[in-house]
Amino acid sequence: MSTLQYPGPPPPSSMNLHNPHMNHHHGLVGPGLAPLSAPNGIQSLNTLHNGSGPPSHTPFYIDNILGSRLNMTGPARPTPTLPSPTFPAHMNSAYNSYYEQAVHPGLAAPTPISYGSGAFSSPPPYPFARGDYPHGLIDRHDPYSKVPGKPFLWNPFIQRPLHKRKGGQVRFSNDQTMELEKKFESQKYLSPPERKKLAKLLQLSERQVKTWFQNRRAKWRRVKQEVPTGKGEGDENSHEKPRDLDRDDFSREQVLSNGAACAFTHGGGSEADSLEEKEA
């Protein structure tokens, strides 16, 4: 007994192909939908319906999607090169000289840079070269002899003499004190030419040398007075000598400056000669 076979619904592709007007009126395939490819190499519905060339390119078509993937895997586009900035000639020369030098030009020879005029002008250049700073600081007697101008920051500190104490008393260095003591051992009084020569040698003023010798003579007399007596007449003469020297300091210096003989009228010629021998 044979079974009855009822024909089923036709496939959608055949329905679309045989009923183009239905698709046109009901809008099953719109312009934005992907076309249904027909079997056996039949062209798409839109091509048959419109009777024109290939449809316009839209991002929703399969061919366009596949084509975009192929383009992505293809050769990359050359990256555009940005144009190099151009500078004036003086800026290029400064740029080249900066990299040719091993040391920054600002450290070797600082030059003032002008930024404009008025309130925004460049600050004044450095007072003097860096190599002259140690000489100006170490030199105790003439700190400005080796530099062209005075510094603007340390002016109140360097201008004050370094060997002066707060109370005005002079402080001599060890070398200066040794030279003065050595000279005092051989000569208790100095003539003006000798005082000038010694002051120049020790880099002191003549007034400082004169004051030092006066103080040293006063100390020397005080020490001799404190020595215990026990030798008779010699000790008595030693007691009288400091009083005579105190009176005749100024007159003796005048006599030495004129080159005359050392003669005093206080106690006679013999006493003056004995004083000179003991002082020597």
Swiss-Prot record:
DNA-binding region: 165-224
InterPro entries in UniProt: HD, HD_metazoa, Homeobox_CS, Homeobox_DNA-bind_prot, Homeodomain-like_sf
CDD domains: homeodomain (cd00086)
Keyword Transcription regulation: yes
GO molecular function, one term: DNA-binding transcription factor activity, RNA polymerase II-specific
Pfam families, per the entry: Homeodomain
Keywords linked to the UniProt accession: Developmental protein, DNA-binding, Homeobox, Nucleus, Transcription, Transcription regulation
Positions of region (Disordered): 1-35, 221-280
Primary location: nucleus
Gene3D superfamilies registered for this protein in UniProt: Homeodomain-like
Origin: domain of life: Eukaryota
Subcellular location: Nucleus
Biological role: Transcription factor that may play a central role in activating or maintaining gene expression in the vegetal pole. Part of a gene regulatory circuit with Erg and Tgif that operates early in mesoderm development.
Protein name (database record): Hematopoietically-expressed homeobox protein HHEX homolog
Source organism (scientific name): Patiria miniata
